[in-house]
Amino acid sequence: PEALRVAGLPEALEARGVDVRDLGNLDGPRNPWTAPVEGYRHLDEVVAWNHALMEASYAELQAGRMPIMLGGDHCLGIGSITAVARWCREQGKTLRVLWLDAHSDFNTSDVTPSGNIHGMPVACLCGLGPDALTRLGGTSPAITPAQMHQIGIRSVDPEEKRLIKTHKVDVYDMRYIDENGMKRAVEAALAGIDENTHLHVSFDVDFLDPSIAPGVGLSLIHISE
């Protein structure tokens, strides 16, 4: 987050008419770099960070503002989307999530090859995972697979792919984009949106071509557009 501030992101947003309120950085436990326990790496730390982010995001939504979260591992999408889902239920709005990522992040502890929770956030949001994450906001699942629309996917583990098909997640992968173009993928993912739809965009930098954004943990070559 500090690098984004130094790079002038707040000023760039303000120049486009956005009223920016920088609330500073969230804080949480540091990464202990330990081995997986019962299929999960650093579960306690992930829960703590996501709980902090959920509370901060929900407070901003309650105040009538649009929270924008920058920086961090994409497992933090659990906290931000759980907050938005809760707010949408209370407001009677329909939530739609655009997940822009090179990975589907639909692993579970039963199929993950690594135990890294950054490969599991979408599954956790859909109710597949440890109670501490699937019930982070008190309701499980936080969202249904039908509310999740993924664009730019180009790395999926074999068993993860089976889970995605079983739960019918809407995925526009690189093959679809190569054949139909990014414009059509986005139009399809946004089809049916109306005035009562709340759109949440969750963006992992590895969605971009690594020649543009090389500084990611799991860089994959070439997203065409």
Residue ranges of predicted features:
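Conserved alpha-helical scaffold segments that buttress catalytic/binding sites
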Residues: 1-224
